Amino acid sequence: MKKAQIIVDKYFLIGKTDKRIYGSFIEHLGRAVYEGIYQEGSPLSDEQGFRKDTLELVRELQVPIVRYPGGNFVSGFRWEDSVGPKTQRPSRPELAWGVIETNQFGLNEFVDWSRKAGSDVMMAVNLGTRGPEDAKNLLEYCNFKGGTYYSDLRKAHGYEQPHDIKLWCLGNEMDGPDRKSTRLNSSHGKLS
């Protein structure tokens, strides 16, 4: 057996710790999104349906960055279902957690929520049931100024300016029984 030793010296500084290490994620699991950060019509919520008490706590914690959609949910996420008029968004089976996803809280709501929380956005790309073409379309919707199909669609949804998302996450871990994927685990590295 090989042994190793680590010596920690608080006076030997290499550099500052990147504050993003204290980031978080939000997943459509249980009551994390619906009732946790979003509860339309509640006296605890603001005009967009965002829970004011949760926003206050996230601001107080100074969460620097939040990944969305987090966890296993991203592996079945159809971002197009989560944008546009809420009355036109489809409800679909959510495959990782076995519930119905109403898409009433989606991509644009998350960006708005993050801005109110004072957190940067890390957008996750579905590599479980989708792939590079979908990632390109999502990037176009979020970050292109205009003049393309998806950037103009974002504008039609009421977001004239790009979301300007700087950090992206390629999928989620794909090695457990509750992970949803259309490809072998070994192919995810190549896909990424």
Residue ranges and their predicted role:
Residues 1-183:
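Non-catalytic accessory regions flanking glycosidase/transglycosidase catalytic cores in CAZymes
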Residues 184-192:
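Single conserved hydrophobic/aromatic residue that forms the stacking wall/gate
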